[in-house]
């Protein structure tokens, strides 16, 4: 089953899953649909030809051309694209700035052995692989680039940071 492949990257197995009654589940608020984690996928939906990069909190950053997508995400950028159900798309994601030559917040970049987290126009270097791992990042989501000269130098990531390690819901515009 396809869902088993998705589950495999989260947990080694399902041994710690606890079954609960629907009545118990109903005691909790519905948190809505989960967005893709920033920097891991590009998204679209059936009612548009637009492709978006996902930033923190489900912010969407339109890639206006295939050339921009290729320049940022490589020649096989299209393998990162995931279809999102249109209803989830409009209710779970929020608009962000369009992309041209800079990566959105939440993108993981790699120059040689150095790894960086993009944040507000800066790149934050990871002090070591332990700092990377502590924030639940996946090495498969690193984008190899020649340099990060266009970015400012941010504070080093030295360990777990709540804003990096966990899901951060989008801010409501209400």
Where are the predicted features?
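Short, surface-exposed polybasic-aromatic patches that bind anionic ligands, especially phosphate groups
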Residues: 1-174
